[in-house]
Regions:
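A polyanion-binding, active-site-adjacent surface
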Residues: 11-144, 150-167, 181
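Domain-level recognition of soluble alpha/beta enzyme cores
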Residues: 166-178
């Protein structure tokens, strides 16, 4: 979980995972970002290599349009989260926005093997899938899980034993993942 008052000094890096990564296997370099009021969880497949990052947070590649799309949807300005001068994204705007909206981020893979030197899902081999049920237990207010690609969707469906992958834009129900307390 994150504390909104300390976000500017918070590191989102998962230093233990970074330290145990090898040339062969990469462990997830970021901690799950799960605001206390998380209602929507975005799940990608895995971050790009750190050499492609412009910030230590989700969707860190400056050529990726995720933060531009969020800016356009929520603020009518594709550059709302963009620092053009420094070619990075504005974490000082992103974090409070996500906390206010209750939007969380993580990925469907906890460890991967890159089959080529790039960020393409096509060349990611799952070594350790994320325990999505355990992740959702941490955010009981979550009502929507959004996957951001085919590989993330496949892994999520495998986790919940859903045999038919949804088409793009289609919503499906996943089993109740919250423990009865």
């Amino acid at each position: 979980m994150v504390n909104s008052e300390s976000h500017q000094s918070t590191s989102f890096l998962h230093t233990e995972n970074i330290a145990r990564s090898t040339a062969e296997i990469e462990y997830h370099p970021l901690r799950p970002f799960l605001p206390d009021n998380c209602k929507v969880l975005f799940l990608g497949s895995f971050p790009p290599q750190r050499k492609r990052w412009c910030m230590d947070f989700y969707y860190p590649n400056f050529i990726n349009d995720h933060w531009r799309i969020e800016g356009l949807i929520f603020f009518g300005d594709k550059d709302y989260f963009v620092d053009k001068v420094n070619k990075t994204f504005r974490l000082e705007r992103i974090i409070p926005f996500l906390e206010e909206q209750g939007i969380g981020f993580y990925d469907t893979n906890t460890a991967v093997r890159r089959l080529q030197d790039n960020a393409s899902d096509k060349f990611l081999e799952t070594v350790e899938p994320t325990n999505v049920s355990a992740l959702l237990e941490l955010i009981p207010q979550c009502r929507v899980v959004v996957t951001t690609g085919e590989k993330a969707t496949q892994i999520l469906c495998q986790h919940f034993n859903i045999s038919k992958l949804p088409s793009v834009g289609q919503a499906i129900s996943i089993p109740n993942v919250y423990s009865e307390k």
